[in-house]
Amino acid sequence: MRLSEYKRSNSAQNFDEFFRKGYVSILYGDSGVGKTTISLYLCLLAGAGKNLFHNLLKVKEPKKVAYISLELYKEDILEKLEPIRKRYRISTSEMEIMDLDDISDYRSFEKILEQKRYDFVVVDSFVAFYEGKSIYDPVEVKEFIKKTRKLARNSESHIMFIHHTIKSSGKNKTDRYQGVSTIKFLTTPFMQAYTEGKSFRVLTIEKHNFAYPFEKIYYYINKNGAITWYINEKAKYEEILHKFEPILKHLKDREYGMKTDELLNLSGLKKRTFYAHLNKLEEMGIIEWHHKGSKVSRVSISKRFKFILKRNNKFKRE
């Protein structure tokens, strides 16, 4: 999907706006990228009233949060939280931890939210509470999301599910999700449910190479509002520009773009690398394809990215 907006880590948002009450979101990514760690980080710091992601999200006051795990026991979660507690010297947090001893199914989950009020609820994992016969059935997926959105609205909470693709670590309590791939999960039913629904958000985590305190977090927001977090120390804005500079430097002043063959010759890149870069640039919303029939005839920098370049004074005329 084309991303129409790029945001840097210093573009702070209010936690209440980012995780709106009455919304349902799902956090997915490849196994081992840090979904559980990031979710625990969100809960602990939001519950302590601390700003998140190196001030990416502003927390005005402590949030009432709940972390519900059907994959790990409480003692395992507390162990994972310890490095974050020590790093930020957190002694108290409005964070409640629950596992299978507290919640066993969706109905018990509903009862908990009916009895208590939480600003933010994380459920690990999506499949553990899913009531349909198949997560590949778009009708069943949409019905489940619709039902959960209603619960989120009634309880005035933001409910975020973690979706594990293929589990690589942790003490499993269920193997219902084993072998489910991100690609298969997202290709039809889930994305259909997302694009056709309201009050629903998709959050993804890409390749990681991170360490506390998560200072190197960047994110994109696509035209539908889906968010992708890039938790990669090397994925800095300037480095992204530098990586694609051979292409961008030839496009920056050309209002109508350039022919692909001409651009390939000027870029100094191998053909395979050149087209791989173009695909990535298009995916990120940095460039736009221009077609002549079924063939791509030329490429230009997107209007949105031109604005970003101008705002950040990048690639000025020499």
UniProtKB/Swiss-Prot annotation:
- List the keywords (alphabetical): Plasmid
Cited Pfam families: AAA_25
Highest rank taxon of the organism: Bacteria
Q: What is this protein called?
A: Uncharacterized protein aq_aa20
What is the originating organism of this protein?
Answer: Aquifex aeolicus (strain VF5)
